[in-house]
Amino acid sequence: AVFLAVIHHILHKGEDREKKKGNIPGVLFGLATVTELAATIYVNKKRKEQLALEPEQTAQSSRKKKTIANDTEESENGRRKKKILITGSGSYVGTSVEAWLKQWPEYYQIDTLDMRTQTWRTHDFSAYDVVYHVAGIAHADVGQVSEEEKKQYYRVNTDLAVETAEKAKREGVQQFLFMSSMIVYSGCKEKKITKNTIPKPLNFYGDSKWQADQKIQALADERFKVVVLRPPMIYGKGSKGNYPQLAKLAGKLPLFPIVHNQRSMLYIENLAQFVKRMIDNEETGVFFPQNEQYINTSDLVQMIAMVKGHRLVMVPATGWVIRLMKKIPGKIGILT
């Protein structure tokens, strides 16, 4: 396929942003990171295609506004300001969503809560309409983790998440958003994940997310709406995980295998807009927010190398090349 791509520096983006509109702007596709400067590759020229949203089930949420005893604050146009608690201060996703929502201070009041100590247990959740849980451990080098470290993944990704959801429900929070992950499908053979794909985590990291995913869904009822988000690899300025590592490798490796795969990705501001939509519409259900277009890993690596001015030789994906890539620390090998 021929890519109609425009290299766009994230540090200078934003000229197209329409603060007062609720629609989701252009689908962003790919990432080329050059040290502190991240570049985004657009699929289309207009950058106005809608983000592909595929809910696992039809969200059947009531649009009725419920009155909270200690919250009667309204914005100038009569819309009641929602109070949102982000549990997991300092996270990349949490801070990005917080910054996005703060563009509309008349509609959202946002607090963050550090979950690394036990003080969160005494925090009053009853003052909030929405709790958005982003605390968790990610980016595991699954091949080099001790048994004790694995237990820590379950304590944080499973136990902490479920206990937070239970507290939110017990104290009258109307909606709980949980950041699960596409990693719950890591053991599936399907190349493209759909609403019919049954989760099958491949390792302890994916399983820790899947355990929480199921238990939190079970808490949902008419008074407690639960949104489970299973995003793919998230990218953007300052992102962590696979793609900054991949960008670094693309500027150093002399060769890279030609692989015929398709990977879904999600630009951080598209995720932030999606979270805003979930809150505004008081949704409930399981969702897979992702860019509409899938990307081929080899094509992405070539683009990154080109941006960096690095000569990268693409070679057929023979057995020895794939085995070599699999030995790369972290999760980069999975991308091939």
Name these PLM-found stretches:
Residues I84-L101:
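N-terminal Rossmann NAD(P)H-binding glycine-rich loop of SDR-like oxidoreductase domains
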Residues Q152-L160, N203, D207-S208, L266:
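Glycine-rich NAD(P)-binding loop of the Rossmann-fold in SDR/ketoreductase-type enzymes
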Residues R121-E163, K167, V184-G187:
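NAD(P)H-binding glycine-rich loop region in Rossmannoid oxidoreductase-like domains
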Residues Q214-K237:
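Conserved beta-loop-beta element that borders a ligand/cofactor-binding pocket
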Residues Q245-L266, N270, R277-M278, F288-Q290:
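A conserved pocket-lining segment of Rossmann-fold NAD(P)-dependent short-chain dehydrogenase/reductase
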Residues F274-I334:
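Mid/C-terminal beta-alpha module of Rossmann-like enzyme folds, strongest
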Residues A1-N77:
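Short amphipathic, positively biased membrane-proximal segments
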Residues V162-F204, L219, V227:
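Conserved Rossmann-fold NAD(P)-dependent oxidoreductase catalytic core, especially the SDR/UDP-sugar
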